[in-house]
Amino acid sequence: MKYFYAINILFFLTVNIGISQTQSEKKKIIGTYNKEEVSSLQSFIDRVSNERNLRVENFLTQNPSVDRNKVIEGQSYQIFDVLDGEPIYRTVDNVNSAIATRTNFLHNGGGLGLNLEGQNMNVGVWEEHHARNTHVEFSNGTFPPASRVTLADYNSGSSEFSDHATHVSGTLIARGADAFAKGMAPQASLVCYDWNNDSNEVEAEIQTNALLISNQSYGVPIYNSQGGQNAPTWMMGCYNIDAQLWDAIAYTYPYYLQVLSAGNDGQSTYTGGVASGFDKLTGDKNAKNNLVVANAANPSVSSEGDLLSLAINSSSSQGPSDDGRVKPDIAGDGTSVYSSTSGSNTSYGTFTGTSMASPNVAGSLLLLQQYYNSLHGQFMKAATLKGLVCHTADDDSSKPGPDPFFGWGLLNSKRAAEVIQEDTSGGSLISELVLNQGEMYTKSFTTTGGSPLQVTICWTDPPGGNQSGSLNSTVPALVNDLDVRLKDPGGFIIHMPWKLLIFNINSPAIKGDNVVDNIERIDVDAPVAGTYTIEVTHKGTLLNSSQDFSLIVTASDFSLSNDEFLSKNFKVWPNPVKDQLYYSFKSVSQGDVNIEITDINGRLVYKNT
């Protein structure tokens, strides 16, 4: 038998991240959409939106003294819905941020040599108002300058710029005219909408432009800034119709990931929650398929990218969801973030909140999509991206495993990018798979042990049942319950995934059968050397008879056991390459082996048989 191996290598002198969200890439993603599911989703969005608008209009008609919009202590509030007869308002919930999440290692001149800055990539932002698109940070660096920010629904007669929208957008894509304000993806483009009709507009952007990532730094707070309770008690932690709606969008469009702020109610207290000091997430922040971001308080990181200290900002809203799911999902740095503001084309400001942590994460994830596409010619599904960043996040060492403060930990863009690179040479595994009804998926791999071993599965789950009005309902929102198990080399020890204890949420996470989360991660801190076997199964009947899922595996000297994946035994170093390239290959075949090494632009740089 003859084996052929084509290996992509990064060369410092020739690297050029040119593959990104081109029209052909957009068409490829758009071509995967199911027209019947799209039509059903659009009807659902319209129904929810129309019913909500009718409730608001009827309330305003019956209460003419109440304003739809108001400003309290400089913060804007707008009636979002009317529940239990009361108006529900919503409100808005960076060099240092890039360092904290190690995103700077991906930039031009960063320690990984990747030169990823969002070239030809696009991100969506929904905000209370619009970003000042003429700000110097949003120019494309040409003369005459052109803005990289498109104001999609801006009306010069009635729309306005806001500091919040301009600051969030700067955290995402500021080019670094002021070096201290450089954003996560400083060469990316951004489309900005106000928050009215957000679900309709997101769906349209996905349909038209294959939107991969959106940032939404707003939500329904527990209290307004005058101290009055804004949200009904049942709403905190509840999988309500808003969570259901955004899960429906994600399930219909599996490449789209909604990134949003957890909220700033960390110090708020109320009566009737799951536990004192917890259960403060509202609306779509309780969805399953999005990425909800907590606010870390200026994490300390070494020059090599190692985390030195980690603490949560006390204002960051705590989870979990009422059914015990891990929420928030991950943490970013949103404390004292310096970025652009709307006062002028050269104004800046320092803000704190999960509103700032969310774009820190969203912009970083855009670069990870860019990198993966440059190596594979396609983007990751949202479940793969979410699973990857939760797999590689830095854990809060005071509480091993996930928790309702940080989620899975602080985003580590550097480690996530390294796993993407290792996957191409067999040092780790990132795989997008399908589990059919009644099947068991198995995969074996070997490791030399010593350093931690991790296995993660993540999937975009169908929307669950609407629990609106139910206080602290523990009914799982999970529809397709997949399970991952890991057998040790002797087959006698079965390692289980993490899970939270909803009835004792103050206690650390434990390991066991997880029946609520659509991400499951197994950690083995001190694995023995040998061959391990991953098993993925499901409970009950799978909706639609199958479930796509993503698998991420990292371990010391990792290698797959199957001949089918023999190319994973091909090792190349260093990568990126400066002067000399080395490779080794341990063959289990007596057949011929053809080796071709190309750079990421497709140029052949080495060939041998």
Language-model region placement:
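Secreted peptidase-domain scaffold signal
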Residues: 14, 409-480, 551-560
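Subtilisin-like serine protease catalytic core
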Residues: 21-25, 92-214, 223-226, 252-257, ...
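N-terminal domain-start motif of subtilase-like serine proteases
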Residues: 37-75, 79-125, 151-161, 242, ...
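Catalytic-core environment of secreted peptidases
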Residues: 132-135, 140-143, 296-359
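Short acidic, glycine-rich surface-loop motifs adjacent to enzyme active sites
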Residues: 208-239, 257-263, 458
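Hydrolase catalytic cores
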Residues: 332-399
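Noncatalytic accessory or regulatory domains flanking protease catalytic cores in secreted, cell-surface
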Residues: 349, 402, 481-551
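Residue-level detector of functionally pivotal "anchor" positions at catalytic/ligand-binding pockets or at interdomain
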Residues: 553-573, 588, 603
